[in-house]
Amino acid sequence: MTRSITSRMQITIKTTADDHRIAKLAALAIGLHLIESIVPSPLPGVKPGIANIITLYVLYRFDFATAAWVSLLRIFAGSFLLGHFLSPTFILSLSGGISSLLLLAIAVKLPKRWFGPITLSILAAFAHIAGQLIVVRLWLIPHAGVAYLIPIFATAALVFGIINGVITAKLLADNH
């Protein structure tokens, strides 16, 4: 007798401890992202990026690959849960996330004496904003006037980069 098409098929996916760790950390980052999404922003487009604390923490506690997975899973899952997947909001989040990850991939190799969590948080925040503003300028608002937003967003990146960096440094100090 031949097997029916509708017979049960078992698919087994083997997961590792690293997979479970990434899933837990991504879930934490997604939760922070969702909480942040319900808090009203004083300026449109300006958010503190508290989920990035998790990414930076993971970068220091584990490695770049784990941090990249956590960041990208947060961007994709957060956009699905908030209904933004493939929208301009998603594209902006992804461009900012990729920009900051690219910068962190380089910055993590710099001397830790001068490039600690606060410095990397500030640099990543600036890279995030730069990536987003480039997409805005090239795609959403192809006008030179977008440059007038740079001081506002740069100030926000500096302030929130410092705050998130201090929180990350505190978390790292508490866990060592």
Tell me what each language-model feature is:
Residues 3-57:
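Hydrophobic transmembrane alpha-helices
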